[in-house]
């Protein structure tokens, strides 16, 4: 009796199906046997006899357990036993049947199929056929008499044997074909494996560039892989087809055998050799011939399989139970454990249903039915189902009208192979489709808390909304990740109400709102959005900077500092390495602000239905300011250049680039709103790209005009995207400056911050969520910490009022950047939530590593990359050795050389800032300090006082200066070396943004380097990888400072991958200027260069940095080098006799001439790392086709020219400038660059002791009374420009002179602007040396003359503009331009202009900070405020850090 499977619905279902089929098969076989025996033999009563072993032949096996030979009386009480075996690959079914009714019938011999196993031989050597024997128990004599019939049955079954031979041949052919196809498949897989390995080697190669890798992969590897995949698929299909053909032929063969052999019915099928062990030779039971049999009969439709089992194991008892295994008709697919039917008692019939009554059969059927269960709806709802569709058990009861797919399908119609709702526990692990509680939670039921999404839902028909959404779709609400194309996230609109908009961003479809908790944290979403990088090991770069962990060494270090009489850096200054950034200084305030905004959101968003926003949308506001209403804010550092001034008519006609629908409006806004005559390089390209909806990466030097790239598109309404521009800015002080500047231009700009009253924040937030602002400045901490801010942005996006996202100072995104901010990495939120909104990333400092990080972390999509030269020609770079008198040298220079001029002194820590500021105050200099440890209001007051010239010098950490709007900074001192070359460029770039000559002076000390190393190594917030990164960057700074030979400008620009010819420096750095005072010699470094190339070539595949290679070449035995066995290289230690600076110079030169090459790779942390490899010119060097020679200093000057004596008057010196000026980009090289101030008046600068530095207003002979105020201002500006040029030219002379052109001549030149030598001669008696020097002023005079003529035209334009403005106030038909025609950019609705004016006034009240105090009070509050020191004490400190008591 078959045991019914339990706790398994699928098994139970299959078992029922198999049982029904099996009973039919049994009926068919039994009837055929009955008919055959009844017709062939008479009934006799003979005792059963067991044949001898010799009769059966040597190939027999004791297999079937029969009735012992105890005579006819014993057999008369036995029931029929019929043995039949149904076989598949691993399962067999056996039945044994005997009948006392046919005990006298002799045996019937049926020849077996012999397609696989050859026939065994008789003892005589003759070949005989094996037969499957059906032998009822009979007398031995009858068996002996019929033995001849057994052997003679060969002729009677000749046709069957022939058919078997044909089947054998067909089956062998099919198997050979399958084997051949499988061999071909194996070879194809091997070829595919080789191609994949080759692909991996190309990807991991360090000797190939990225372009070369892509070319090889696309040209060689990918086509072959594609062809190989097609070939493998084809072979797999052929193998499957061949197997199916063989199976079908076996089935037809089996059917033909059964149908054509009435006299040769197969009565027994042997079990598989794997399932059965042969009996012993001493067995007295009936034996049957062990031959191969068909794997399955035609009844089951299985494949034919021939096996042979020879009796070798004779130790098993013949009384072993027979196993009858139920065949699973899908065993080829499901490797299920067999269901075993074990032979029961002797009275158990083989076919129980033939002997059962109807009642017994009904009882058996009831016992075998599937267990009853309630009807359950397993179907997942789709788009056509109603919203109230519910999965679960109550579908029929609660929703009788819903038609189920299961009702249309019968159990037999279901394919078990694809069944997904009845699985076992083992299958659950593989398919994860077992029904569990999460299936019932798939649909949000109505019993959820109705107030859970109050902020986002209105009282509308939810089901109708979702049905509408499912029909129309919302392309804006579905994000398809580029990393995983199958992951889609449906975002929600913060409001259910759809505001109509004509913009691209608006689609009138209601959004499906997800639960708030799911939006805040979704594990599946996080996993799908995260990038996966290989966990391969990358050898990290090594620095030769020694570890300073010894306390004794630190004590000796401090003792040396004290002996020198100056307070150097010490461990007391150790703090978190990046603490000076303004990181998360407002987190607590942001949390409080977020709570306030939540209240605002609840009031505003829930009341939108009652008080909908006005139907009008903000259009272009009417500008009331005229050209004459320029204020001193026009010198904003990023969007004005005096040298670019041309007439407006010329600008409007000069459009060489492509034109767009918004081009006219862009030019109009540029002139009328920003009061600018034209664009700087790359500005127009950036504006057009973002108005097209593209992502943009803008890389411009400081003062290059980055802000205009997003401020101008913010006021242009005709682009593809329009609305509110969100600007992510790192510093609150920077945001305040930007907002104040934009409000002065009547641009609706505001900022989110925790400052101000709750009412002011409420007003700003209401303007923001309604899309009434052009620009909104938000800090990255606000984006990551405030959920209300994110919801407001989501509402803007849903309403089609989100124009673009701007990331200012984007280098903060990169871990390689000098101002890394962790919250910046969260800004990828924008491209994931709003993928179709364009993004702009702007920065002034970005190496190749930083650029890769920015694009990767912000997830920019094919950004338009705009880059220009980083060369700041008006900056003078100088590096001096730091001594104990350095602070006094700085004080003397500020009081003499930089008298009445503002500047910055950068220090490395808060303590150093306070000490330096106190020392300068004691020397009579108006100075204050600025660092991140101060209160925000204190920092703001110091910054405002410095910008208003109430403070001359500000001592600050790196927390100060980012985006500072002060163009006339004349000097930047680094009292301590900067931490990175990026930071050095950024901080020095804050000088001379008006284009005038400025100085960048750095003081260098190895003790400062060692102290900063200690700060990095002891920073607990940095892991080992980041510590090495910072140490490597610090070593680059050290190499830059210690280099006294190469051009400073070339060294800085090479860091940004920009090639620069040092001849173009024109002695604008200390190394180029001092080159005349040192003795250099030329050395041939070809041989060391070859050794370096061989060294790099031998270890470049291990991803080594250039600093690591320098250490190996120098002979370092650091732990990394020893562990990597690089100390055994032939090139190790070859350069031990050379100085470290010389080795660094050689490596740097090899990279410059492309013998070596640096490349960047994204590491496991998601940041780019730079490594070195041989370059394209390495082969020329190794083959002797290239020689390398370099200049080395053999006698460096003992002391550099003192900065205090740089301006000694020397009238007889001729400037060392080429007599034939070289033109670069249209400018004379001797002249300063064209980045100059926008102010109409610059202060007078006096240099110590010089008589030329008068600060009183300029008066011209007998003409001042006849000139207007505007003309006088122009004269003063012209004089200052010429005077500044004279100072710059004097600085370039060797030695420098302080009176390159006398003041009296400069004043006359400012009045008449002579264009040639003859006009210059009319100035009066002029010495010959000044006539020779006049040629250096010609280009500047031509520029000034052009500007003066354009201002004369603007004077008349101003009168016309004023007239039309007055006329517009009295007319309601619009405003006319100066040409008399109506501007298409002005709206006819004057109410709109009034509303815009009200919005700007409201912003001013809520955003503008209070005015700073007067000069005296401001200075007094700064200089005398008692700050809390680093040790917690209050009071004044002298420079050495000692506290003085109050008097």
Curated annotation (Swiss-Prot):
Swiss-Prot/TrEMBL cofactor(s): Mg(2+)
GO molecular function, one term: DNA binding
Basic residues bias spans: 1425-1447
Name assigned to this protein: ATP-dependent helicase SGS1
EC number: 5.6.2.4
Record's subunit section: Heterodimer with TOP3. Forms a complex with TOP3 and RMI1. Forms a ternary complex with a MLH1-MLH3 heterodimer (MutLbeta) during meiosis. Interacts with TOP2.
GO BP annotations listed: chromosome organization; DNA double-strand break processing; DNA repair; DNA replication; DNA topological change; double-strand break repair via homologous recombination; gene conversion at mating-type locus; meiotic chromosome segregation
Organism classification: Eukaryota, Fungi, Dikarya, Ascomycota, Saccharomycotina
Residues covered by the HRDC domain: 1272-1351
Biased composition (Acidic residues): 403-415, 552-561
Annotated ATP binding sites: 714-721
Annotated region (Disordered), positions in chain: 37-78, 243-264, 342-430, 552-572, 601-639, 1402-1447
Motif DEAH box in this chain: 808-811
NCBIfam families in UniProt: recQ_fam
Keyword Nucleotide-binding on entry: yes
Effect of residue 31 to P: In allele sgs1-34; temperature-sensitive
Sequence ranges of Basic and acidic residues compositional bias: 243-253, 363-386, 601-611
Cofactor binding comment, as recorded: DNA helicase activity on G-quadruplex substrates requires Mg(2+).
CDD domains in the cross-refs: DEXHc_RecQ (cd17920), SF2_C_RecQ (cd18794)
Domain called Helicase C-terminal: residue spans: 886-1035
Cellular-component GO terms for this entry: chromosome; cytoplasm; nucleolus; nucleus; RecQ family helicase-topoisomerase III complex
Induction: Expression is regulated through the cell cycle with an accumulation in S phase.
Top-level taxon in the UniProt lineage: Eukaryota
């Amino acid at each position: 009796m078959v045991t019914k499977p339990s706790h398994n619905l699928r098994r139970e279902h299959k078992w029922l199906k198999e049982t029904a089929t099996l009973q039919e098969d049994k009926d068919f076989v039994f009837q055929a046997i009955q008919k055959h025996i009844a017709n062939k033999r008479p009934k006799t009563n003979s005792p059963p006899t067991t044949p001898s072993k010799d009769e059966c032949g040597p190939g027999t096996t004791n297999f079937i357990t029969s009735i012992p030979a105890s005579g006819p009386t014993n057999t008369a009480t036995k029931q029929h036993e019929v043995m039949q075996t149904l076989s598949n690959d691993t399962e067999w079914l056996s039945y044994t049947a005997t009948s006392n009714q046919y005990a006298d019938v002799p045996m019937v011999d049926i020849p077996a199929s012999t397609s696989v196993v050859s026939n065994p031989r008789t003892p005589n050597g003759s070949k005989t056929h094996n037969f499957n024997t059906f032998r009822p128990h009979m007398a031995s004599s009858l068996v002996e008499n019929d033995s001849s019939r057994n052997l003679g049955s060969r002729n009677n079954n000749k046709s069957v044997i022939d058919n078997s031979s044909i089947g054998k041949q067909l089956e062998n052919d099919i198997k050979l074909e399958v084997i051949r196809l499988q061999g071909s498949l194996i070879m194809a897989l091997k070829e595919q494996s080789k191609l994949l390995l080759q692909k991996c080697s190309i990807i991991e190669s360090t000797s190939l560039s990225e372009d070369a890798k892509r070319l090889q992969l696309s040209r060689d590897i990918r086509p072959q892989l594609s062809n190989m995949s097609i070939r493998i698929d084809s072979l797999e299909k052929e193998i499957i087809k061949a197997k199916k053909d063989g199976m079908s032929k076996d089935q037809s063969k089996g059917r033909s055998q059964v149908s054509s052999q009435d006299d040769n019915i197969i009565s027994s099928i042997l079990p598989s050799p794997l399932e059965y062990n042969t009996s012993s030779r001493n067995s007295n039971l009936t034996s049957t011939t062990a031959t191969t049999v068909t794997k399955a009969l035609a009844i089951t439709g299985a494949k034919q399989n021939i096996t042979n089992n020879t009796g070798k194991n004779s130790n098993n008892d013949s009384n072993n139970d027979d196993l009858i295994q139920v065949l699973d008709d899908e065993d080829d697919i499901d490797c299920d454990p067999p269901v075993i039917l074990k032979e029961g008692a002797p009275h158990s019939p083989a076919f129980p249903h033939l002997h059962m009554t109807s009642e017994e059969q009904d009882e058996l059927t009831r016992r075998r039915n599937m267990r009853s269960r309630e009807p359950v709806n397993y179907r997942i709802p789709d788009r056509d189902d109603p919203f109230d569709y519910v999965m679960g058990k109550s579908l029929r009861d609660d929703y009788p009208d819903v038609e189920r797919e299961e009702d249309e399908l019968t159990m037999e119609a279901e394919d078990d192979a694809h069944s997904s709702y009845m699985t076992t526990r083992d299958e659950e692990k593989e398919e994860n489709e077992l029904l569990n509680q999460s299936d019932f939670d798939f649909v949000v039921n109505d019993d959820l808390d109705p107030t859970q999404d109050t902020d986002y839902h209105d009282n509308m028909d939810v089901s109708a909304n979702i049905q509408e959404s499912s029909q129309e779709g919302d392309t804006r609400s579905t994000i398809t990740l580029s990393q995983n194309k199958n992951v889609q996230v449906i975002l929600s609109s913060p409001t259910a109400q759809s505001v109509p908009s004509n913009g691209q961003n608006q689609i009138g479809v209601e959004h499906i709102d997800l639960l708030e908790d799911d939006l805040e944290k979704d594990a599946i979403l996080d996993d799908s959005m995260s990038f996966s990088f290989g966990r391969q090991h990358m050898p990290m770069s090594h620095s030769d900077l020694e570890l300073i962990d010894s306390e004794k060494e630190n004590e000796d270090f401090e003792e040396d500092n004290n002996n020198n009489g100056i307070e150097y850096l010490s461990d007391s200054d150790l703090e978190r390495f990046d603490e000076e950034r303004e990181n998360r200084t407002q987190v607590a305030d942001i949390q409080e602000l977020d709570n306030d905004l939540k209240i605002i959101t609840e009031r505003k968003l829930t009341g939108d239905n009652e008080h909908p926003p006005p139907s009008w949308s903000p259009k272009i506001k009417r500008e009331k300011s005229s050209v004459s209403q320029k204020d001193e804010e026009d010198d904003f550092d990023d969007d004005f250049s005096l040298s670019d001034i041309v007439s407006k008519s010329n600008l409007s006609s000069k459009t060489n680039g492509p034109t767009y629908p918004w081009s006219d409006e862009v030019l109009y806004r540029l002139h009328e709103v920003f009061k600018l005559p034209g664009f700087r390089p790359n500005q127009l390209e950036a504006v057009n790209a973002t108005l097209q909806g593209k992502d943009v990466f803008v890389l411009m030097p400081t003062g290059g005009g980055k802000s205009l790239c997003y401020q101008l598109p913010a006021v242009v309404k005709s682009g593809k995207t329009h609305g509110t521009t969100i600007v992510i800015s790192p510093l609150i002080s920077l945001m305040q400056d930007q907002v104040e500047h934009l409000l002065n231009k009547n641009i609706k700009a505001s900022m989110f911050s925790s400052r101000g009253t709750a009412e002011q924040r409420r007003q700003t937030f209401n303007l923001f969520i309604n899309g009434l602002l052009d620009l909104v400045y938000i800090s990255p901490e606000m984006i990551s910490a405030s959920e209300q801010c994110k919801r407001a942005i989501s509402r803007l996006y849903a309403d089609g009022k989100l124009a673009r996202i701007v990331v200012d100072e984007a280098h903060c995104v990169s871990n390689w950047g000098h101002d890394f901010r962790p919250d910046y990495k969260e800004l990828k939120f924008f491209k994931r939530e709003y993928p179709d909104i364009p993004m702009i990333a702007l920065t002034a400092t970005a190496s190749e590593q930083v650029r890769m990080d920015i694009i990767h972390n912000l997830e920019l999509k094919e950004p338009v990359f705009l880059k220009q030269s980083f060369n700041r020609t008006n900056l003078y770079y100088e590096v001096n050795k730091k001594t104990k008198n350095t602070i006094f040298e700085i004080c003397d220079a500020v009081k003499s050389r930089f008298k009445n001029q503002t500047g910055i002194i950068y220090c490395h820590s808060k303590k150093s800032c306070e000490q330096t500021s106190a020392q300068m105050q004691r020397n009579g200099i108006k100075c204050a300090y600025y660092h991140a440890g101060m209160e925000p209001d204190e920092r703001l007051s110091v910054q405002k006082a410095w910008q208003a010239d109430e403070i001359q010098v500000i001592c600050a950490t790196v927390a100060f200066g980012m985006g500072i709007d002060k163009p006339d900074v004349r000097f930047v001192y680094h009292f301590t070396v900067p931490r990175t070359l990026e930071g050095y460029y950024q901080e020095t770039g804050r000088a001379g943004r008006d284009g005038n000559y400025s100085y960048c002076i750095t003081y260098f000390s190895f003790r400062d380097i060692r102290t900063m190393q200690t700060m990095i190594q002891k920073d607990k917030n940095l892991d080992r990888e980041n510590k090495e990164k910072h140490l490597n960057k610090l070593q680059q700074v050290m190499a830059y400072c210690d280099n006294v030979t190469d051009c400073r400008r070339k060294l800085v620009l090479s860091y940004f991958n920009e090639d620069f010819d040092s001849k173009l420096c024109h002695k604008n750095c200390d190394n180029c200027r001092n080159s005349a005072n040192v003795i250099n010699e030329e050395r041939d470094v070809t041989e060391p260069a070859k050794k370096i190339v061989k060294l790099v070539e031998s270890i470049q595949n291990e991803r080594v940095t250039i600093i690591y290679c320098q250490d190996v070449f120098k002979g370092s035995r650091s732990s990394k080098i020893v562990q990597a066995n690089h100390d055994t290289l032939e090139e190790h230690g070859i350069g031990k006799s050379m100085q470290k600076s010389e080795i660094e110079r050689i490596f740097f030169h090899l990279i410059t001439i492309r013998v070596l090459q640096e490349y960047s790779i994204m590491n496991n942390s998601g940041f780019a790392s730079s490594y070195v490899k041989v370059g394209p010119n390495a082969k020329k060097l190794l083959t002797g086709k290239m020689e390398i020679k370099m200049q080395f200093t053999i006698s460096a000057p003992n002391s550099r020219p003192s900065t205090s004596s740089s301006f000694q008057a020397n009238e007889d010196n001729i400037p060392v400038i080429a007599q034939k000026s070289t033109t670069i980009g249209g400018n004379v090289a001797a002249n300063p660059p064209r980045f100059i101030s926008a102010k109409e008046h610059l202060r007078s600068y006096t240099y110590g002791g010089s008589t030329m530095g008068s600060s009183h207003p300029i008066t011209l002979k007998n003409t001042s009374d006849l000139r207007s105020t505007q003309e006088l201002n122009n004269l003063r500006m012209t004089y200052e420009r010429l005077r500044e040029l004279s100072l710059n030219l004097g600085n370039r002379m060797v030695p420098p002179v302080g009176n390159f052109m006398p003041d009296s001549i400069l004043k006359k030149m400012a009045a008449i602007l002579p264009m040639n030598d003859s006009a210059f001669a009319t100035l009066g008696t002029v010495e010959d040396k000044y006539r020779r020097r006049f040629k250096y002023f010609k280009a500047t005079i031509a520029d000034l003359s052009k500007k003066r003529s354009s201002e004369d035209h603007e004077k008349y334009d101003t009168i016309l503009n004023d007239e039309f403005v007055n006329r517009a106030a009295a007319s309601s038909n619009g405003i006319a331009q100066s040409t008399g025609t109506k501007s298409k950019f002005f709206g006819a609705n004057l109410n709109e202009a009034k509303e815009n004016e009200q919005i700007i006034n409201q912003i001013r009240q809520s955003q503008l900070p209070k005015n700073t105090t007067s000069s005296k009070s401001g200075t007094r509050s700064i200089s005398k405020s008692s700050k809390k020191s680093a040790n917690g004490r209050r009071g004044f400190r002298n420079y050495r850090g000692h506290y003085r008591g109050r008097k």
